Amino acid sequence: MLPTKQAACSFINVAFSYNELPLIRELSFSVYEGEYVCIVGHNGSGKSTISKLLTGLLKPQAGEIKIFGKTVDFDNVSYLRNNIGIIFQNPDNQFIGITVEDDIAFGLENKCFSRQKIKAIIDEVTLQTQTDGFIKQEPHNLSGGQKQRVAIASVLALNPAIIIFDESTAMLDPKAKKTIKQFMVKLAKQGKCVISITHDMEEVTKADKVLVMNEGKLIKQGKPVEVFTSEQELQKIRLDIPFSLSLSTKIRGITSTIDYQTLIKSIAKLWKKR
């Protein structure tokens, strides 16, 4: 029997309101080690509030959050922050150092690591994120995709078990988006718990699990193919269905005796609805 994966983070009946407006309502879910999870929903659905709760910027008003089975004490969030790293939509807000190398070293220096250990970690994470070619450059002068890779390298250097990507691909061109999405999948395969808060509905097709938020509630969760077969339910909240999953569902509904012309027409019809 394979060993059971541990829940890296769990929300248990969590609630949070702002000015009496409920932003999160009795939210319960778990994300496991080695799992890549996408959280989707419209603006105001509660996605970003989840991110703020996970990073200790907000404190639940009800319920509890557990990290590796330990209930988070929001009066002392050091345990929480030691286990979680976050990459934001605009990495410029995260840069501290004059050079890429300085920026990655900053968090390590705060942990009082030796220079030798810091150099070894920087060498490892810059190679992994393909940022080793410009570690002496100023991060603000890099392209959008390069900046995000530097932000990822800075997070990886601290070796958190849980990595949150908060709309991290929203400002990137298609090529850079693809690179960052590949990192997410790769990190999960390496055993990290990867949580992506996203509006990119094609990204979710690569996820192990999808959480769909609406008005502070978790309305669906499961594998992408399970979640997005309920098209009518998701269309009620005007959530786009990933084209590839919509196409897959429609093709499965076509009998094996159908001719190719009809199949092509069905595909073309779906494409026009994008």
From Swiss-Prot:
ATP binds at residues 41-48. The keyword Membrane applies. It comes from the Bacteria. Keywords: ATP-binding, Cell membrane, Membrane, Nucleotide-binding, Translocase, Transport. Its main location: membrane. Residues 9-240 form the ABC transporter domain. It is an enzyme of class 7 (translocase). It is a peripheral membrane protein. GO terms for molecular function: ATP binding; ATP hydrolysis activity; ATPase-coupled transmembrane transporter activity. Gene3D superfamilies: P-loop containing nucleotide triphosphate hydrolases. Pfam families: ABC_tran. One of its GO terms (cellular component) is ATP-binding cassette (ABC) transporter complex. Its EC number is 7.-.-.-. It is found in: Cell membrane. Coiled coil: none annotated. Belongs to the ABC transporter superfamily. Energy-coupling factor EcfA family. ATP-binding (A) component of a common energy-coupling factor (ECF) ABC-transporter complex. Unlike classic ABC transporters this ECF transporter provides the energy necessary to transport a number of different substrates. NCBIfam families: ECF_ATPase_1 (TIGR04520), PRK13648.1 (NF010167). Forms a stable energy-coupling factor (ECF) transporter complex composed of 2 membrane-embedded substrate-binding proteins (S component), 2 ATP-binding proteins (A component) and 2 transmembrane proteins (T component). This is Energy-coupling factor transporter ATP-binding protein EcfA1.
